[in-house]
């Protein structure tokens, strides 16, 4: 019922932080990632959809790319220039809101969602929308302790989560009485 006080009991609730916040370990790994703004790119791949690569040579409308990540790692191939897309700087890896990405293309969106999923960060914003990638596992992110993280916080003050959306909706509803 609206306006009802909920008692927050955190005794048996596990810490949701590893499933909500980008850890220092992840940030360190991202900072060490090699990146060349002129050569780093994504290219299409039949199974993985996109692979990261480095542009080695451009000849007219053809681009020679050495794959640096994925099942083709180490392989060099030639692609049409329109199929080669730019990679965001590493500081945008595991980005909480994809509307902040420098290069907003299919590969960048899929890469960011995949990276967050691998790190067990299943919620991501895309502007006004909250994207959830279902891990088909139970994470301790729907507990009273997690509710406490999001209670009375604005969406930009906490990591992406459906509770942030709910809190914003509740706050707006209370203001528009």
Please describe what each predicted stretch is:
Residues 1-177:
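N-terminal entry segment of cytoskeletal motor ATPase domains
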